[in-house]
């Protein structure tokens, strides 16, 4: 089975649209843009089909990993893209995710616990890693929402925007995301 989802932008996928902005509910397996593989369909091409305009611009204000689902904002013109990028750079926009994670061995975590992780991350060859020097600062906040046996539902809030930041930080806390083959344990059986 392919990990590439077909891109069907039905009415339920478009959460908001005006002349400057489109908010899209991205399914897992879908690329946000052509940066990874210019020959693969991505949300930008699907939005041009949705708009019925092959020359329309849809510029992602941020990205989600291919395997991640969630809301992605696209600017429909350069001035809107500039304004959105400024908001992300100045941190006037916040992002929050939910993830099911493996609990650390002998964890004393309970629902409502909050955790932070600060480190330096270096990204190369498709992987990010925590390093003592030579990386960029990364800061994440986490809240335990629910615990069920060996798993926990976490709210994850990146304070910086490093590649794979939340995945690396959760793995460093010995709480990798379930199903994360790159930074986590073996898949849940």
Model-derived segments and spans:
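RNA pseudouridine synthases
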Residues: 1-189
